[in-house]
């Protein structure tokens, strides 16, 4: 969720700096790489810096044209994914 919190929906430069479009070419060979390409973090947007950032996450999803998400993670990711689902975001969650 950290990447979503770094994006300012009104600033195209921050979108470009904090997101990557996945294409056939960009994901080719991932299966032969070790480690992770996901750049994970332990951030809960509901408690980030003592301010609920759910609205910002929803704005970023809208700005990026994301109408469904597949989330992979632990308890925190699954909890926030369920929170987004209750708000109408289409989410498929996969526990780690």
Residue ranges and their predicted role:
Residues 84-96:
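Short, acidic/small-residue loops that bind anionic groups at enzyme active sites
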Residues 7-8, 82:
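Short, well-ordered secondary-structure micro-motifs
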Residues 60, 83-84:
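Hydrophobic/aromatic ligand-binding patch that stacks against planar heteroaromatic rings
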Residues 72-79:
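Gly/Ser/Thr-rich loops at beta-strand to alpha-helix junctions
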Residues 51, 82-83:
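A generic "cationic amphipathic patch" detector
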Residues 71-72, 94:
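Structural motif
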Residues 1-7:
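Short connector loops at secondary-structure junctions
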